[in-house]
Amino acid sequence: TMKEVIDKMNMTEITSVYGLTEASPGMTQTNAADTFEKKVNTVGTPFPNVEVKLIDPDTGEDITEVGKKGEIVCRGFNVMKGYYKNPEKTKEVIEDDGFLHSGDLATIDEDGYYSIVGRIKDMIIRGGENIYPREIEEFIYTIDGVQDVQVAGIPDEKYGEIVGAFIIKEEG
């Protein structure tokens, strides 16, 4: 974990950068002066001259509510012009207004710090309800004796998908 890296390697000024190859070198970053909690629980605030926002993945509407999940998108000098000789793929990820879709789900806090909470493609849709595997995994990790867990959608005739959890128990 980030705490272990900071403690064991005495890297007190470590920061986190979030971004994609398509938005190099990144979109957001924590700062060395940020609190420990901000460093380990968020991916920071936007780089200068880079616009970052959250949108509803279904409607494309902006999300400004603190703590509400949405797709993190950005535009700025860091965003690629497009995929080489692949305008169709480019059109899928870059809007006409220049915003690049990350495919990642995030929240924003009251201080403007973003936290990545999952991937859109990983989302399980059960009877019209959006379920985020990462939330379930984090809960299962709180159970004593769990070493690792992976949650995925399993096809279901009635609901479209149901939740499956694959758990590795700790030895002993």
Task: Give the positions of each predicted feature.
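Active-site glycine-centered loops adjacent to acidic/histidine catalytic or metal-binding residues
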Residues: 19, 44, 104, 128
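Glycine-centered tight turns that cap/initiate beta-strands
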Residues: 10, 49, 89, 145-148
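Short Gly/Pro-enriched turn/cap motifs at secondary-structure boundaries
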Residues: 41-46, 94-97
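Gly/Ser/Thr-rich phosphate-binding loop
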Residues: 1-38, 51
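Conserved beta-loop-beta connector loops within the AMP-binding
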Residues: 53-73, 92, 110-111
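AMP-binding/adenylate-forming catalytic core of the ANL superfamily
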Residues: 76, 81-82, 105-172
